[in-house]
Amino acid sequence: MKNNLNQLIDIFENQIPANKMIGMKVDQISVGKVKVHVPYQEMFIGDYRQGFWHGGILASIADAAGGLAGFTTLTSPEDKINTIDMRIDYLAPAVKSDIFVEVNLIKVGKRILNADVVLYQKDIHNPVAVARCAYSALRN
């Protein structure tokens, strides 16, 4: 799918129901690198007393964005990516504001891809969460 990044954006934003429901938008995409943002919605609140984002929503965003970065390395429409492992560290509360995500693939092997994912709100140097994701690549 390296050759058609615009098609990947459409699939990611419009054809994956969970991504569409969350409202994920691709800001930048290149092979192995992705920037995504998610506009804040009231339904994302997990701690209603303090108004913080639900950690599960943040994990879903990290996983989806990391998978998109993995898809940028594939060459055939029949190739597939599956999450095999993910670790997320929550570093600060995510408040009632948009979430921004930057993903960098750190290793692209024949069968395994590894991604570093940073989720932040105002400043990438002050992240709300970081994740390390591993994906299996099923290449045809």
How would you name each of these model-derived features?
Residues 56-57, 64, 85-90, 117-119, ...:
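Hydrophobic alpha-helical segments of small multi-pass membrane proteins
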Residues 3, 94-96, 100-102, 106-140:
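HotDog/MaoC-like acyl-thioester-processing domains
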Residues 55-76:
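Active-site helix/loop of acyl-thioester processing domains in fatty-acid/polyketide metabolism
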Residues 22, 32-34, 82-86, 97, ...:
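A generic structural signal for short beta-strands and their flanking turns/coil linkers
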Residues 69-100, 105:
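Hydrophobic beta-strand-centered segment that forms part of the acyl-chain substrate-binding groove
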Residues 1-18:
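Extreme N-terminal tail/first-helix region
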Residues 40, 74, 135-137:
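Short beta-strand segments enriched in hydrophobic/aromatic residues
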Residues 23-52:
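Catalytic strand-loop segment that frames the active site of acyl-thioester-processing enzymes
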